[in-house]
Swiss-Prot record:
Protein name: MICOS complex subunit MIC60
Membership in a protein family: Belongs to the MICOS complex subunit Mic60 family.
Species of provenance: Pyrenophora tritici-repentis (strain Pt-1C-BFP)
Regions of this protein lying in the Mitochondrial matrix compartment: 17-125
Biased composition (Basic and acidic residues): 226-237
Protein's cellular compartments: Mitochondrion inner membrane
Keyword Nucleotide-binding: no
Transmembrane domains' residue ranges: 126-146
Alphabetical UniProt keywords: Coiled coil, Membrane, Mitochondrion, Mitochondrion inner membrane, Transit peptide, Transmembrane, Transmembrane helix
Positions in coiled-coil regions: 311-408
Length: 641
């Protein structure tokens, strides 16, 4: 968005720039306002003064110098003389001043010269990029030489200083991998001035006697010593040239080899395989064998004259050093292996701990899931068992009623049978008495009919009483099991329908406040909870008189915070004692006595507890009515004869 706005604004800026460009040139011509030295005469277009600089890229600043009038040249320099001036060295032009006295120099403004175009530093950029790319290519070649063997051969053979660069990085890699041997020289240290011995490649491989007139280790020659023997040369062969003798090396005189010298030379003792430290290593045994072979060959040479004793002693010491290096390397490798094993053990322990933690988390999650499933299953089973219990209770009720009917039916059948038997006996007796006792028989029949009618009324009364008791218990159960107040119109209507013509039951139901069974009444727990909240408010107003104002309310509220709360069956008529006794009575279940205690309050305490007393009154009315109905049912069951 920003680029688009800049691009759209460029065409509008160009006309303004064209219009302002002449103004810039005019502003450059206002040179008359500058301060000038009237005692000096300036020449227009003076020759540019340049100062040589050591490097073209860092020009030195040029200080302005005022040219005296005596040193001013007669004419301006040619235009071509300023072409070769260095662009990096700035030129200074003195300010133009009007002539003083009888001068011939004309004062005129300098013509405006176009700004010189900046030279493109193509060659310098080319050299810079060439250097950067060459360095990157060289570095990439060194890196790839360390990776690829084929490119390594090509790079070290055809690229200048490629072998040195690759060797440097290989040496760094070797020092990084083997830090213990990084400081040790790989080659035998050479001592300046010592006699150097050149040993052929195949010398000492076989132990055979030396042959005469043959090039071997036993014969003296260039391979024995690097110092050339200064032998005398014949004048005929040298052509008049004298042999050159080195000033540093003395002339060695040839002496014949004698048998006494070979006998006097001490034989070199070979190495013992068992005395060498770490002799059990196969590599050490091979090296000891090679050194012993060399010692055997040297001892077989009778002309060695102890020349190789120092070299072989040094070889023995170097062997000991190599063995110590091998032992150190083994110890280092063992330590590294032990460290790796410990790291692996630590890693395995960490992995095992993480696995145990994951298993613990999984077990906890599974345990939580099982608990949830168990709770859900328990709730489901509880609900199913409740439904099953309800259905079984209903079935048991029906079975009980049916069994009662069956018993009554059996009893009536038995009575009819007994009546029939009695009639038969009577008939037989009458037959025997030839209708002598017809009057007695008719009276007995009337008594039996009366007894049957009475039994039917007893059965009906028992059923009615039982239904009434069940209805009363249903209402009580609904009131006791409710969590929040619920209407019990249905249960009360069923109770009234069962009671039908009973005036006592109808009067008891009529005495209940309609708001009680339409809205419901609170349970004992709700009344206790409501009482505790009301008791807090009553305590705040315990010290208030009947005509209390705002200040009295605030004072009573403040004093209620410091009053001691009584507990138990406290003695006294004060508010705190009444509240304590009421709370104890409520906890004991004596709602009537608790309501009587609260009803004895006076003033604001009674006003605040008025709603709670009305709820207690409705609860007591309902309980009293239910108790009356239950008592009436028991009385009816007792009055049946």
């Amino acid at each position: 968005m920003l680029r688009a706005s800049i691009l759209r604004a460029r065409p509008a800026v160009r006309p303004l720039a064209r219009a302002a460009r002449p103004q810039w040139h005019v502003a450059q011509r206002f040179y008359v306002d500058d301060k000038k030295n009237l005692g000096e005469t300036a020449v227009p277009n003076p020759a540019p003064t340049t100062q040589p600089s050591s490097s073209p890229s860092n020009p030195t600043p040029v200080q302005e110098n005022t040219i005296p009038a005596s040193e001013v040249p007669k004419g301006p320099p040619a235009p071509d003389s300023t072409i070769g001036a260095s662009r990096d060295a700035p030129t200074t032009q003195p300010s133009t001043t009007p002539p003083t006295g009888t001068g011939t120099a004309s004062v005129a403004p300098d013509p405006i010269k176009p700004l010189p175009k900046k030279k493109r530093r193509r060659f310098r950029r080319f050299l810079l990029w060439l250097t950067i790319l060459s360095g990157l290519g060289y570095a990439g070649g060194v890196w790839y030489s360390l990776v690829s063997d084929n490119f390594h051969d090509f790079f070290t053979e055809y690229i200048p200083y490629g072998e040195d660069a690759v060797a440097y990085f290989e040496e760094r890699e070797f020092r990084r991998r083997f830090p213990g041997r990084a400081g040790e020289p790989r080659l035998h240290p050479q001592i300046s001035g010592e006699n150097k011995v050149t040993i052929p490649g195949r010398s000492g491989l076989t132990a055979r006697p030396a042959k005469e007139n043959s090039s071997d280790l036993a014969s003296r020659g260039p391979h024995v010593s690097a110092v050339d023997d200064n032998k005398k040369q014949d004048k005929t062969e040298s052509g008049g040239q004298q042999p050159k003798v080195s000033s540093q090396t003395p002339v060695a005189k040839e002496q014949p080899v004698q048998a006494t010298e070979t006998a006097s030379s001490k034989a070199i003792t070979p190495l013992d395989h068992l005395n060498v430290p770490s002799a059990t290593e196969p590599v050490v045994q091979d090296v000891v064998k090679i050194v012993n072979d060399i010692i055997t060959v040297v001892n077989a040479d009778n002309a060695h004259d102890g020349k190789y004793n120092s070299a072989l002693d040094k070889a023995k010491s170097e062997l000991t050093k190599v063995v110590s290096d091998i032992n150190a390397m083994k110890e280092t490798l063992e330590q590294q292996a032990e460290a790796k094993v410990k790291a692996a053990h630590a890693e395995f322990d960490q992995a095992a701990k993480e696995l145990i933690q994951r298993l613990d988390h999984q077990m906890q999650a599974q345990e939580t899931q099982f608990k949830e499933e168990f709770e859900n299953e328990r709730e489901r089973l509880s609900q199913s068992y409740k439904e099953r219990l309800q259905s079984e209770l209903q079935a048991a009720q029906k079975v009980y009623e049916q069994s009662l009917k069956n018993r009554l039916l059996e009893q009536s059948i038995k009575m009819q049978k007994s009546f029939t038997a009695t009639v038969r006996e009577r008939v037989e007796a009458e037959r025997e008495g030839r209708l002598g006792k017809l009057n007695e028989l008719s009276s007995s029949v009337h008594e039996l009919e009366k007894l049957t009618a009475e039994w039917n009324s007893v059965v009906d009364a028992n059923l009615k009483t039982q239904h009434l008791v069940v209805a009363v218990e249903a209402v009580k159960s609904a009131l006791e099991t409710q969590v929040v107040p619920k209407p019990f119109v249905t249960e009360l209507a069923a109770l009234k329908e069962i009671a039908a013509d009973d005036p006592v039951v109808s009067a008891a139901i009529a005495s209940i406040n309609p708001a009680a069974y339409q809205r419901g009444i609170p349970s004992s727990a709700l009344l206790i909870d409501r009482f505790r909240r009301v008791a807090g408010e009553v305590r705040k107003a315990a010290l208030l008189p009947e005509d209390a104002g705002m200040a009295s309310h605030l004072a009573s509220l403040a004093m209620s915070k410091v009053l001691f709360k009584k507990s138990g069956l406290a003695v006294g008529a004060d508010v705190e004692a009444v509240l304590a006794r009421t709370e104890v009575l409520l906890e004991e279940g004596d709602l009537d006595a608790a309501a009587r205690e609260m009803n004895g309050l006076q003033g604001w305490a009674k006003v605040l507890s008025k709603d709670w007393l009305s709820e207690c009154r409705r609860v007591l009315e309902v309980k009293q009515a239910l108790d009356v109905i239950a008592t009436e049912a028991r009385l009816n069951s007792l009055l049946i004869d």
